[in-house]
Amino acid sequence: MKAEAAIVNLYSPGDTLSLHRDVSEECNRPLVSISLGCDAIFTCGLDDERVATLRLRSGDAVLMSGESRYAWHGVPKVLEGSCPDWMADWPGEQYQEWEGWMKGKRINLNVRQMFA
């Protein structure tokens, strides 16, 4: 995989990412999704019978490739209060007015290859 594009999403408790399929782009190339901050519930499935539900923690990465690139997937829940302590207190003294801001946030970074 050659990283050519990235999307950064910011979520708060109560935010969701509805089930969807990535059909607006060529899906034969892998996608890497990295989670930071609060934990989230991630659901992925090709049909009603083959569904996986995972708890994504800060620092987890998901690789979607092959058949999974065409799967329905989404984030029905961000888990409030699950941000690791070291990140919940970030950024610290230099930007003290922002201290604790990440405590209720989840950052998702999606990296993908766009061209052959």
Which residues does each PLM region occupy?
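Conserved double-stranded beta-helix
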Residues: 1-41
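Catalytic core of Fe(II)/2-oxoglutarate
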Residues: 38, 43-116
